[in-house]
From Swiss-Prot:
The gene is nadE. This is NH(3)-dependent NAD(+) synthetase. It comes from Burkholderia pseudomallei (strain 1710b). GO terms for molecular function: ATP binding; glutaminase activity; metal ion binding; NAD+ synthase (glutamine-hydrolyzing) activity; NAD+ synthase activity. It catalyses: deamido-NAD(+) + NH4(+) + ATP = AMP + diphosphate + NAD(+) + H(+). Its EC number is 6.3.1.5.
Length: 284
């Protein structure tokens, strides 16, 4: 791909993902708190629900949600934020999860261990005759089951509380397709949309997060065989490079091509289910 064509694609993707050329943490916090509050009031909902993992994304989204419901209550509209701990058995980074909860200061915290449900589904699949190529493939499948069990738990609580599920997706994860479809990608409201990873961190700092939380190495931590595997190991590039791609900063052509490959391969994750009427190139 020529350099001008690559630059044009970068601009188009940044626009599609709503990455602004400018950023002010205080202004962005105000916009996003107001958005969540307006959504709840307009929809007649009374709760926000979000799983708090101990990472910076869920911590930041959770704090924004808590501030949104506090704003609503101050105006006379009753709403609450429910933080959920959703470990798979014992959590390796338990101390980080506790630090995150201290920052978020949720109205309520519920803990649901997804291990029994996830393991039961894996066993049921085996009993039904599903075989795997190897242990690594089985572990990959189990990882996605974990993410989807967490989604089930959050929607169960949201249904019981007349609430909405908050998602943690932002532009840097979205462009790479780094989320489980109908797992952590399953949500109603995305208060971090349009932000690069460095901007999520800047927003968290402005909201009062401490540096160990802000700078924690991002990990989905879904793989039992490779616990706490950093996201960047899966990408083969860094979040700094992904952010540079989205913010239009100078970068190596090969790195930009890597981002474009991930973007193209994961297009289906960012779309509603396809029909023959909207799949590119298919005669309807």
């Amino acid at each position: 791909m020529s350099r001008p064509d690559q630059a044009a694609r970068r601009r188009a993707i940044a626009a599609e993902l709503h990455v602004s050329p400018t950023f002010d943490a205080r202004d962005e916090a105000e916009r996003r708190i107001g958005f969540v509050a307006d959504y709840l009031r307009t929809a007649g909902l009374r709760a926000c629900v979000l799983g708090i993992s101990g990472g910076i994304d869920s911590s930041t989204a959770g704090r924004l949600a808590q501030l949104a419901v506090e704003r609503l209550r101050a105006s006379g509209y009753d709403a609450r934020f429910v933080a959920m701990r959703l470990p798979y058995g014992a959590q390796h980074d338990e101390a980080d999860a506790r630090r995150a909860l201290a920052f978020v200061r949720a109205d309520e915290t519920l803990t649901v261990d997804v291990k029994p449900a996830a393991d039961a589904m894996l066993a049921a699949l085996a009993a039904g005759g599903l075989a795997y190529l190897d242990h690594a493939q089985q572990d990959f499948v189990l990882g996605n089951i974990k993410a989807r069990e967490r989604m089930i738990a959050q929607y169960a609580v949201a249904g019981a509380r007349n609430g909405v599920v908050i998602g943690t997706d932002h532009a840097a994860e979205s462009v790479m397709g780094f989320f489980t479809k109908f797992g952590d990608g399953g949500a109603d409201v995305l208060p971090l949309a349009g932000l690069t990873k460095r901007r999520v961190r800047a927003l968290a700092r402005m909201l009062g997060a401490d540096e160990p939380l802000v700078l924690k190495t991002p990990t989905a931590d879904l793989e039992t065989l490779r616990p706490q595997r950093p996201d960047e190991h899966a990408y083969g590039i860094t979040y700094e490079q992904i952010d540079d791609f989205l913010e239009g900063k100078p970068m190596d052509d090969a790195v930009a091509e890597t981002v474009l490959r991930f973007y193209d391969a994961t297009r289906h994750k960012r779309a509603l289910p396809y029909t023959m009427f909207d799949w590119p190139g298919h005669p309807a």
